[in-house]
Amino acid sequence: MTLRRAARRAAISWIAIAISVVASIGGATALDYPTRPVRWVVGFAPGGANDIIARLIGARLSERLGQQFVIENKPGAGGNIGAESVINAEPDGYTVLLVNPSNFINTSLYANLQFNFPRDVAAVASFIRVPNVMTVGKGVEAKTAAEFIAYAKANPGKVNMASAGTGTSTHLSGEMFMAMAGIKMQHVPYRGAGPAVTDMLGGQVQVIFDSMPSIIPHIRSGALRALAVTTATRSSQLPDTPAVADTVPGYEASALFGMGAPKNTPKEIIEKLNKEINAVLAEPAVQKQLVELGGDPVIGTPEAFGTLIVSETEKWKKVIEDAGIPKVE
């Protein structure tokens, strides 16, 4: 009996030692992370807002953590190709995703997705909210959102609303505005914001809910006129322009960007990335560059960003369903 007790105690001691060693290794892994370059997937081509934001923050993370955050552009299917590649990657912290509005929208817009974004992506950190701007051409007499709503109600279906394409945030921002303001406009989708803005300048279409970086040069030049921004409050870039919510209470349709990782990425790694990203977002030089992109930093926990991912996905799902937008096969 004594030998059995001794053997049992020895076995328990070895198990305890093994658990302690594994725990210490796990802690060391998180503490030392990253020990090699991190692949940061951006689901769009180089040069756009997604790419610019990732490169800005990635450069500072590379400096702070001593390993390169290598931007890998994987465009296609509205960002779905890039998202799926990250979702299917090893959850070890060495593959991350630039999260953007298309990820929230596509969950309801695409019929045959092989993933559920809020379920299959681990939220790491939010970066920035960028407003769209409700903008009209010189031929539109309305000087405020309220005047525009009154005009649209008096002329149902006669106002043309441009967008960068069906299902984009520029389209759905307008659909939400129509639903909440009780008006009807004709949607005119374009292949990107560039040609849409060109026709705005030419007077072929009357209104667009375009992204701040794309539209603000034309507003500042006086070629187009801003009626309202789509964030819940005014933007520091257009401080004299009210929010849509000042006229349509509850309206909010900004573009949220952040970092995601494969589900089951170790919590310690996510928390370390979150801490470093928040430190980067607090740097005055980075804040200045983000403001120049038209947005304001959103500093928070992984849990807070996860909650935002769910709420944004649900918001756009309702807009898509209420507008009767057909799913992309």
What do these predicted regions represent?
Residues 29-119, 158-160, 166, 182-211, ...:
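N-terminal (or domain-start) structured segment
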Residues 1-8:
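N-terminal secretory signal peptides that target proteins for export/translocation
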Residues 8-18:
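Sec-dependent N-terminal signal peptides
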Residues 88-94, 109-195, 244, 249, ...:
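Hinge/capping helix and adjacent helix->loop/strand transition within the periplasmic-binding protein
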Residues 35-37, 179-181, 220, 267-329:
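An extracytoplasmic/periplasmic, membrane-proximal ligand-sensing/linker region
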Residues 195-252:
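Anionic-ligand binding region
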Residues 23-27:
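N-terminal signal peptide c-region/cleavage motif recognized by signal peptidases
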